[in-house]
Amino acid sequence: MKTLLLLGALTAGLVACGTDDTDGTNDGGGSDATNGVDSPFGNKDGSGSSDGGSTGDSCYAPVDMYIMQDRSGSMGDDCNIGQTVNSKWCHAINALSGYFNSTAASGNAAAIQFFPLPNQSNALCATGTGYDVAALPTPPPAYTTLPTNTFDSLLNSQNDQGGGGTPTEAAIRGLTKFTAGNRRGGRVTIGVLVTDGDPNGCDENLTNLSNLLQAHFQATTLRTFVIGMTGATDANLEQIAQGGMGPLHAATVGPLTNACGTSAAPCRHWNVGDGDPQAFIAALAAIQQASDGCVDGGGTVNPN
């Protein structure tokens, strides 16, 4: 229940517009006056409208997110949604299902792919081919509107046995191609990379990987967020996330008490430990809030 309340509080910011953020940045502070709880990227004056309308000082800029989920062998044992197998994979698919089905995500949309692909090879490293196509939905449309249980059957059918290694370069190239090629007017497009490991296979140079995301941001103004799970090195993920240009956030964000892991706060990547569903959902909700195109420092709203 605490998680769903947090989701509701964070999502309320998606329809707030015309606020006055005195320093023009998202500093991890702020209070949501409507809900009476701290919002990690909330409007400081609490004056935002929540009616989702297009008149007055309100606006509506929902988020389209492309999630690239690690399914390397280190994610642990397989399970189905609702089961409580103590593995990062099981935690992750339960958290993703919880977020996709939550009414707090209403109006936003998602697409998902997994890495490594079963046919992963070195030839895919420099192109991202296959990773630039969602496992769900099968376009058109490019994204599935939330909330929905449409993803549940896919999550149950997948497992943590991809083609071997953690080909982060291929995943990033596919993610950036997908988000650049699937921008819908009046909405904010973001990429979300979720991994429990350091790059293993393809280009493993952290500067090069960060530069791929930086070049994507400079060309498109689209942000890429990085979520790390136990097994990944926080310093490495933070270096990659710097290129993605997600807003800086504090170490404590809602129920997340170690959101930067071992990296100094504020940081850009998100640490969710072993993928505890409450922490994972809270991170997705905070990322959604950080992408709010209706507040200073939020995501870029795609032109109509």
Predicted regions span which residues?
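Sec-dependent bacterial lipoprotein signal peptides
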Residues: 1-15
